[in-house]
Amino acid sequence: DWVTGFEKETGCKVNVKTAATSDEMVSLMAKGGYDLVTASGDASLRLIVGKRVQPINTSLIPNWKNIDPRLKDAPWYVVGQQTYGTPYQWGPNVLMYNTNVFKTAPTSWNVVFDAQNLPDGKPNKGRVQAYDGPIYIADAALYLKATKPELGIQSPYELTETQYKAVLDLLRAQQPLIHRYWHDTTVQMSDFKNEGVVASSAWPYQVNGLVNEKQPIASTIPKEGATGWADTTMLHTDAKHPNCAYKWMDWSLQPKVQGDVASWFGSLPAVPAACKESELLGAEGCKTNG
Protein backbone atom coordinates (compact mmCIF):
# COMPACT_ATOMS: atom_id res chain seq x y z
CA ASP A 1 0.00 0.00 0.00
CA TRP A 2 1.86 3.06 -1.26
CA VAL A 3 -1.26 5.24 -1.36
CA THR A 4 -2.33 5.61 2.29
CA GLY A 5 0.99 7.09 3.37
CA PHE A 6 0.86 9.60 0.53
CA GLU A 7 -2.65 10.71 1.48
CA LYS A 8 -1.70 11.13 5.13
CA GLU A 9 1.46 13.07 4.36
CA THR A 10 0.05 15.38 1.69
CA GLY A 11 -3.68 15.64 2.38
CA CYS A 12 -4.32 14.71 -1.25
CA LYS A 13 -6.96 12.11 -2.09
CA VAL A 14 -6.15 9.38 -4.60
CA ASN A 15 -8.91 7.96 -6.82
CA VAL A 16 -7.78 5.11 -9.06
CA LYS A 17 -9.20 3.93 -12.37
CA THR A 18 -7.64 0.82 -13.89
CA ALA A 19 -7.52 0.00 -17.59
CA ALA A 20 -6.79 -3.30 -19.33
CA THR A 21 -4.94 -1.93 -22.36
CA SER A 22 -2.99 1.07 -23.57
CA ASP A 23 -5.76 1.85 -26.05
CA GLU A 24 -8.22 2.08 -23.16
CA MET A 25 -5.91 4.43 -21.28
CA VAL A 26 -5.57 6.71 -24.29
CA SER A 27 -9.35 6.73 -24.65
CA LEU A 28 -9.87 7.58 -20.97
CA MET A 29 -7.38 10.44 -21.17
CA ALA A 30 -9.18 11.76 -24.25
CA LYS A 31 -12.44 11.89 -22.29
CA GLY A 32 -10.75 13.80 -19.48
CA GLY A 33 -11.39 14.01 -15.78
CA TYR A 34 -8.02 12.56 -14.79
CA ASP A 35 -4.92 14.26 -13.40
CA LEU A 36 -2.36 11.53 -14.07
CA VAL A 37 -1.89 8.36 -16.06
CA THR A 38 0.77 5.67 -15.94
CA ALA A 39 1.24 5.23 -19.67
CA SER A 40 3.19 2.48 -21.36
CA GLY A 41 5.56 3.18 -24.21
CA ASP A 42 2.95 2.37 -26.85
CA ALA A 43 0.64 5.04 -25.39
CA SER A 44 2.93 7.83 -24.21
CA LEU A 45 3.75 9.29 -27.62
CA ARG A 46 0.12 9.10 -28.69
CA LEU A 47 -0.80 11.12 -25.61
CA ILE A 48 1.93 13.67 -26.34
CA VAL A 49 1.07 14.06 -30.03
CA GLY A 50 -2.62 14.20 -29.17
CA LYS A 51 -1.92 16.96 -26.62
CA ARG A 52 -3.58 14.94 -23.86
CA VAL A 53 -0.60 15.43 -21.53
CA GLN A 54 1.56 18.44 -20.72
CA PRO A 55 5.29 18.96 -20.14
CA ILE A 56 6.37 18.90 -16.51
CA ASN A 57 8.86 21.00 -14.57
CA THR A 58 11.33 18.49 -13.15
CA SER A 59 12.77 21.11 -10.78
CA LEU A 60 9.52 20.79 -8.81
CA ILE A 61 10.21 17.09 -8.26
CA PRO A 62 13.03 16.69 -5.69
CA ASN A 63 13.23 12.92 -6.18
CA TRP A 64 13.93 13.35 -9.89
CA LYS A 65 17.58 12.95 -8.95
CA ASN A 66 16.91 9.33 -7.98
CA ILE A 67 15.99 8.18 -11.50
CA ASP A 68 18.08 5.57 -13.28
CA PRO A 69 20.28 7.53 -15.75
CA ARG A 70 19.38 5.02 -18.46
CA LEU A 71 15.76 6.17 -18.27
CA LYS A 72 16.40 9.90 -18.24
CA ASP A 73 15.66 11.74 -21.49
CA ALA A 74 14.16 8.58 -23.02
CA PRO A 75 12.44 9.17 -26.39
CA TRP A 76 9.10 7.74 -25.26
CA TYR A 77 8.46 10.66 -22.89
CA VAL A 78 10.93 13.40 -23.84
CA VAL A 79 9.96 15.16 -27.07
CA GLY A 80 11.34 18.42 -28.44
CA GLN A 81 13.53 18.80 -25.33
CA GLN A 82 10.41 18.82 -23.17
CA THR A 83 9.79 16.22 -20.48
CA TYR A 84 6.29 14.74 -20.39
CA GLY A 85 6.33 12.78 -17.16
CA THR A 86 8.33 10.76 -14.67
CA PRO A 87 9.54 7.19 -15.22
CA TYR A 88 7.41 4.75 -13.24
CA GLN A 89 8.50 1.13 -13.82
CA TRP A 90 10.07 -0.93 -16.59
CA GLY A 91 10.83 -4.53 -17.46
CA PRO A 92 11.60 -7.12 -20.13
CA ASN A 93 9.20 -9.06 -22.33
CA VAL A 94 10.32 -12.56 -21.40
CA LEU A 95 9.62 -16.03 -22.77
CA MET A 96 7.45 -17.80 -20.19
CA TYR A 97 7.35 -21.58 -20.41
CA ASN A 98 6.03 -24.71 -18.71
CA THR A 99 8.86 -26.58 -16.99
CA ASN A 100 7.08 -29.93 -17.35
CA VAL A 101 7.37 -29.56 -21.12
CA PHE A 102 10.74 -27.80 -21.22
CA LYS A 103 13.08 -29.55 -18.78
CA THR A 104 15.71 -26.99 -19.76
CA ALA A 105 14.95 -23.42 -20.77
CA PRO A 106 14.23 -22.94 -24.48
CA THR A 107 17.11 -21.09 -26.09
CA SER A 108 15.21 -19.49 -28.97
CA TRP A 109 11.96 -17.68 -29.67
CA ASN A 110 11.45 -20.20 -32.48
CA VAL A 111 9.29 -22.27 -30.10
CA VAL A 112 6.52 -19.69 -30.56
CA PHE A 113 7.28 -18.52 -34.11
CA ASP A 114 7.97 -21.74 -36.03
CA ALA A 115 5.84 -24.89 -36.29
CA GLN A 116 7.67 -27.70 -34.50
CA ASN A 117 7.39 -30.51 -32.00
CA LEU A 118 8.24 -29.42 -28.47
CA PRO A 119 10.44 -31.48 -26.11
CA ASP A 120 7.42 -33.54 -25.00
CA GLY A 121 7.03 -34.76 -28.59
CA LYS A 122 3.81 -32.86 -29.21
CA PRO A 123 3.34 -30.02 -31.76
CA ASN A 124 3.38 -26.43 -30.57
CA LYS A 125 0.22 -25.66 -32.56
CA GLY A 126 -2.47 -24.34 -30.22
CA ARG A 127 -0.08 -24.37 -27.26
CA VAL A 128 1.67 -21.01 -27.67
CA GLN A 129 0.51 -17.41 -27.40
CA ALA A 130 1.51 -13.99 -28.69
CA TYR A 131 0.98 -10.55 -27.18
CA ASP A 132 -1.90 -8.52 -28.59
CA GLY A 133 -0.09 -5.20 -28.97
CA PRO A 134 2.21 -3.17 -31.24
CA ILE A 135 5.36 -4.20 -29.35
CA TYR A 136 4.92 -7.72 -30.70
CA ILE A 137 5.90 -6.42 -34.14
CA ALA A 138 9.25 -5.52 -32.57
CA ASP A 139 9.42 -8.96 -30.93
CA ALA A 140 9.04 -10.58 -34.34
CA ALA A 141 11.54 -8.15 -35.88
CA LEU A 142 14.08 -9.01 -33.18
CA TYR A 143 13.70 -12.69 -34.03
CA LEU A 144 14.21 -12.01 -37.75
CA LYS A 145 17.19 -9.77 -36.98
CA ALA A 146 18.95 -12.87 -35.68
CA THR A 147 17.53 -15.56 -37.96
CA LYS A 148 17.46 -13.67 -41.27
CA PRO A 149 20.48 -11.35 -41.25
CA GLU A 150 20.06 -10.79 -44.99
CA LEU A 151 17.14 -8.47 -44.11
CA GLY A 152 19.64 -6.09 -42.53
CA ILE A 153 17.47 -5.24 -39.52
CA GLN A 154 19.45 -2.89 -37.28
CA SER A 155 16.71 -1.93 -34.84
CA PRO A 156 13.48 -3.89 -34.30
CA TYR A 157 11.78 -0.55 -33.67
CA GLU A 158 12.76 1.07 -37.00
CA LEU A 159 12.05 -1.02 -40.07
CA THR A 160 12.21 -0.43 -43.80
CA GLU A 161 9.21 -1.37 -45.93
CA THR A 162 10.93 -4.62 -46.95
CA GLN A 163 11.76 -5.50 -43.36
CA TYR A 164 8.27 -4.61 -42.18
CA LYS A 165 6.74 -6.86 -44.85
CA ALA A 166 8.97 -9.74 -43.72
CA VAL A 167 7.87 -9.23 -40.11
CA LEU A 168 4.20 -9.24 -41.09
CA ASP A 169 4.75 -12.39 -43.15
CA LEU A 170 6.25 -14.07 -40.07
CA LEU A 171 3.32 -13.01 -37.89
CA ARG A 172 0.79 -14.25 -40.45
CA ALA A 173 2.60 -17.58 -40.70
CA GLN A 174 2.59 -17.81 -36.90
CA GLN A 175 -1.16 -17.24 -36.61
CA PRO A 176 -2.23 -20.92 -37.04
CA LEU A 177 -0.01 -21.83 -34.07
CA ILE A 178 -1.56 -19.31 -31.70
CA HIS A 179 -3.92 -20.40 -28.94
CA ARG A 180 -4.76 -16.79 -28.04
CA TYR A 181 -3.41 -13.28 -28.59
CA TRP A 182 -3.22 -12.22 -24.97
CA HIS A 183 -3.55 -8.77 -23.42
CA ASP A 184 -5.08 -9.59 -20.05
CA THR A 185 -2.51 -11.00 -17.62
CA THR A 186 -5.06 -12.92 -15.57
CA VAL A 187 -6.44 -14.62 -18.68
CA GLN A 188 -2.96 -15.62 -19.78
CA MET A 189 -2.17 -17.04 -16.34
CA SER A 190 -5.39 -19.06 -16.48
CA ASP A 191 -4.50 -20.32 -19.96
CA PHE A 192 -1.16 -21.64 -18.71
CA LYS A 193 -2.91 -23.38 -15.81
CA ASN A 194 -6.01 -24.68 -17.54
CA GLU A 195 -5.79 -24.46 -21.33
CA GLY A 196 -2.59 -26.32 -22.14
CA VAL A 197 -0.57 -23.25 -23.12
CA VAL A 198 3.13 -23.97 -22.57
CA ALA A 199 5.08 -21.03 -24.08
CA SER A 200 4.51 -17.35 -24.73
CA SER A 201 5.90 -13.89 -24.46
CA ALA A 202 4.96 -12.52 -21.04
CA TRP A 203 5.88 -10.09 -18.31
CA PRO A 204 7.62 -11.03 -15.06
CA TYR A 205 4.29 -10.27 -13.35
CA GLN A 206 2.66 -13.41 -14.76
CA VAL A 207 5.77 -15.50 -14.16
CA ASN A 208 6.06 -14.49 -10.51
CA GLY A 209 2.34 -14.91 -9.95
CA LEU A 210 2.30 -18.45 -11.34
CA VAL A 211 5.49 -19.42 -9.51
CA ASN A 212 3.94 -18.18 -6.27
CA GLU A 213 0.99 -20.47 -7.01
CA LYS A 214 3.46 -23.39 -7.27
CA GLN A 215 2.79 -23.79 -10.98
CA PRO A 216 5.50 -25.43 -13.19
CA ILE A 217 6.50 -22.11 -14.73
CA ALA A 218 9.77 -20.32 -15.42
CA SER A 219 11.02 -17.64 -17.80
CA THR A 220 14.05 -16.93 -19.90
CA ILE A 221 15.47 -14.42 -22.36
CA PRO A 222 16.39 -16.41 -25.49
CA LYS A 223 19.57 -15.97 -27.50
CA GLU A 224 17.91 -13.53 -29.92
CA GLY A 225 17.33 -11.13 -27.01
CA ALA A 226 14.13 -9.48 -25.83
CA THR A 227 12.21 -6.25 -26.13
CA GLY A 228 10.93 -4.41 -23.09
CA TRP A 229 8.41 -1.92 -21.78
CA ALA A 230 8.58 1.25 -19.73
CA ASP A 231 5.72 3.09 -18.04
CA THR A 232 5.67 6.83 -17.45
CA THR A 233 3.53 8.85 -15.05
CA MET A 234 2.13 11.70 -17.17
CA LEU A 235 0.18 14.85 -16.29
CA HIS A 236 -3.11 15.54 -18.10
CA THR A 237 -3.23 18.77 -20.08
CA ASP A 238 -6.34 19.82 -18.14
CA ALA A 239 -5.38 18.39 -14.75
CA LYS A 240 -7.59 19.96 -12.08
CA HIS A 241 -5.25 19.10 -9.20
CA PRO A 242 -1.72 19.83 -10.48
CA ASN A 243 -0.25 20.43 -7.02
CA CYS A 244 -1.31 17.00 -5.78
CA ALA A 245 -0.25 15.51 -9.11
CA TYR A 246 3.27 16.88 -8.70
CA LYS A 247 3.37 15.58 -5.14
CA TRP A 248 2.35 12.14 -6.38
CA MET A 249 5.02 12.12 -9.09
CA ASP A 250 7.62 13.01 -6.48
CA TRP A 251 6.26 10.42 -4.03
CA SER A 252 6.36 7.73 -6.71
CA LEU A 253 10.11 8.22 -7.14
CA GLN A 254 10.97 7.42 -3.52
CA PRO A 255 13.16 4.30 -3.38
CA LYS A 256 10.83 2.43 -1.00
CA VAL A 257 7.74 3.20 -3.08
CA GLN A 258 9.52 2.18 -6.26
CA GLY A 259 10.65 -1.06 -4.66
CA ASP A 260 7.19 -1.86 -3.30
CA VAL A 261 5.59 -1.30 -6.72
CA ALA A 262 8.25 -3.46 -8.38
CA SER A 263 7.59 -6.24 -5.88
CA TRP A 264 3.85 -6.11 -6.47
CA PHE A 265 3.97 -6.03 -10.27
CA GLY A 266 7.10 -8.08 -10.90
CA SER A 267 8.76 -5.15 -12.63
CA LEU A 268 11.99 -3.20 -12.29
CA PRO A 269 12.15 0.13 -10.44
CA ALA A 270 12.99 3.35 -12.24
CA VAL A 271 15.08 4.21 -9.18
CA PRO A 272 18.14 1.93 -8.70
CA ALA A 273 18.26 2.56 -4.93
CA ALA A 274 14.90 0.80 -4.69
CA CYS A 275 16.66 -2.52 -5.26
CA LYS A 276 18.00 -2.26 -1.71
CA GLU A 277 15.42 -0.17 0.14
CA SER A 278 12.23 -2.21 -0.03
CA GLU A 279 11.54 -5.10 2.33
CA LEU A 280 8.82 -6.32 -0.02
CA LEU A 281 11.19 -6.46 -2.99
CA GLY A 282 14.01 -7.99 -0.98
CA ALA A 283 17.71 -8.15 -1.68
CA GLU A 284 17.29 -10.30 -4.81
CA GLY A 285 14.08 -8.72 -6.08
CA CYS A 286 15.58 -6.76 -8.96
CA LYS A 287 17.48 -9.83 -10.14
CA THR A 288 14.35 -11.98 -9.88
CA ASN A 289 12.29 -9.49 -11.87
CA GLY A 290 14.78 -9.28 -14.69
Task: Identify the role of each PLM range.
Residues 35-39, 181, 198-203, 218-219:
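Paired acidic/hydrophobic, glycine-rich loop segments that form the ligand-binding mouth/hinge
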Residues 1-48:
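Early extracytoplasmic/lumenal segment of secretory-pathway proteins
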Residues 66, 168-174, 213-237, 282-285:
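Periplasmic-binding protein-like
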Residues 226-227, 231-290:
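Mature extracytoplasmic/periplasmic domains
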Residues 38-189:
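Extracytoplasmic ligand-binding site segments that recognize negatively charged/polar headgroups
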Residues 24-26, 44, 188-191, 207, ...:
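Short, hydrophobic alpha-helical packing/hinge segments within bilobed ligand-binding/sensory domains
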